């Protein structure tokens, strides 16, 4: 097998059950061209390793100061009441010296370079569980197809060992990158965030045109696809958008999807935004969980009435 560039991975989760069938090992790759306001993984945005600051874990400047002593830049580490609270990101060279010096995990590293074989060593640990549960490997992100060459080689390695593969992708990439991985991909999970290109751009910073075109191409190739809608209050949960989404699935995709999954908005990841010095734009969004779940269930019933197999959550039944 030809050598591929290493993958930049920020998390590997074992025994996941939400992104594909059975028990799975899920790899999360760095880098994403979208900036969805509700994203729970802001550490996935940038395509390189970076650090986050967790001030509650800081020992204190007086007792330690290892980060300050090793940082090659001057005055970019910000301390409040003796504890590290933030980093001036525009002056940071991302050398990771502060993380390497920190003895208390107050400076957390997100992103690690891993070869295909290093990933396979992790994946093989649970091969027996995949076989018994009908599971396998899922690669997510971020946008994993920004590292499509790595994903293709990883999926080739999985296939050679009889391990099922699943790709979770926004599909906001050139079609060529999708084609790179298709021969080795058993299942694709993607989502439709909004049908209106301007509203889509308002909340994700990109248009939906490329995404929808790639979905059409995938269904034309008779690919195994699970579609999702992250249901965000007052963003995409109105009937105008829901009806437009159903029309697209039926008319443009020919209804050729395995399942449509509606995922309820959850306020997750706020602590990570703070650690990265980023604003969390959903901070003031308040949801009555019971009434919102009823609303989502009503939306699922609408899709099912239109002949689209739809469920609430990540299961398929």
Curated annotation (Swiss-Prot):
UniProt: [4Fe-4S] cluster 1 binding residues: 32, 36, 39
Cofactor binding: number and manner: Binds 3 [4Fe-4S] clusters. One cluster is coordinated with 3 cysteines and an exchangeable S-adenosyl-L-methionine.
MF annotations from Gene Ontology: 4 iron, 4 sulfur cluster binding; metal ion binding; oxidoreductase activity
Range of residues in the leader sequence: none
Cofactor(s) required, per the database record: [4Fe-4S] cluster
Cytoplasm found in the keyword field: no
Binding site for [4Fe-4S] cluster 2: 58, 64, 67, 102
Domain Radical SAM core as annotated: residue spans: 18-306
Enzyme Commission number, as recorded: 1.97.1.-
Pfam families hit by this protein: Fer4_12, Radical_SAM
Swiss-Prot/TrEMBL keywords: 4Fe-4S, Iron, Iron-sulfur, Metal-binding, Oxidoreductase, Repeat, S-adenosyl-L-methionine
InterPro entries named among the record's database cross-references: 4Fe4S_Fe-S-bd, 4Fe4S_Fe_S_CS, Aldolase_TIM, BssD/PflA/YjjW, Organic_radical-activating, Organic_radical_activase, Radical_activat_CS, rSAM
List of residues binding S-adenosyl-L-methionine: 38-40, 142, 191-193
Family membership noted in the UniProt record: Belongs to the organic radical-activating enzymes family.
Protein name: (2S)-3-sulfopropanediol dehydratase activating enzyme
Source organism: Klebsiella oxytoca
Higher taxonomy: Bacteria, Pseudomonadati, Pseudomonadota, Gammaproteobacteria, Enterobacterales
């Amino acid at each position: 097998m030809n050598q591929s560039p290493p993958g930049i991975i920020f998390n590997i989760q074992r025994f996941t059950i939400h992104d594909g069938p059975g028990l799975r090992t899920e790899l999360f790759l760095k880098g994403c061209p979208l900036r969805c306001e509700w994203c729970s993984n802001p550490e996935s945005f940038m395509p390189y390793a970076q650090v986050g600051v967790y001030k509650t874990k800081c020992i204190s400047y007086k007792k330690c100061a290892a980060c300050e002593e090793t940082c090659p830049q001057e005055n970019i580490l910000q301390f409040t009441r003796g504890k590290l609270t933030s980093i001036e990101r525009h002056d940071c060279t991302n050398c990771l010296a502060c993380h390497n010096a920190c003895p208390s995990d107050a400076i957390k590293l997100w992103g690690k370079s891993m070869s295909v074989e290093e990933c396979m060593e992790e994946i093989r640990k649970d091969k027996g569980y995949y076989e018994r549960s009908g599971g396998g490997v899922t690669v997510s992100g971020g946008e994993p197809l920004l590292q499509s060459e790595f994903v293709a080689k990883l999926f080739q390695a999985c296939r050679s060992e009889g391990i099922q593969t699943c790709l979770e992708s926004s599909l906001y990439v050139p079609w060529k990158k999708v084609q790179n991985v298709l021969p080795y991909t058993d299942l694709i999970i993607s989502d439709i965030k909004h049908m209106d290109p301007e509203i889509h751009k308002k909340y994700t910073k990109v248009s939906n045109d490329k995404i929808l075109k790639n979905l059409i191409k995938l269904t034309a190739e008779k690919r195994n696809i699970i579609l999702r809608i992250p249901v965000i209050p007052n963003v995409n949960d109105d009937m105008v958008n829901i009806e437009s989404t159903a029309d697209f699935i039926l008319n443009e995709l020919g209804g050729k999807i395995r399942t449509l999954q509606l995922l309820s908005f959850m306020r997750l990841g706020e602590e990570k935004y703070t650690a990265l010095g980023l604003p969390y734009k959903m901070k003031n969004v308040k949801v009555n969980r019971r009434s919102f779940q009823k609303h989502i269930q009503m939306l699922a019933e609408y899709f099912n009435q239109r002949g689209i197999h739809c469920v609430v959550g990540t299961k398929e039944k």
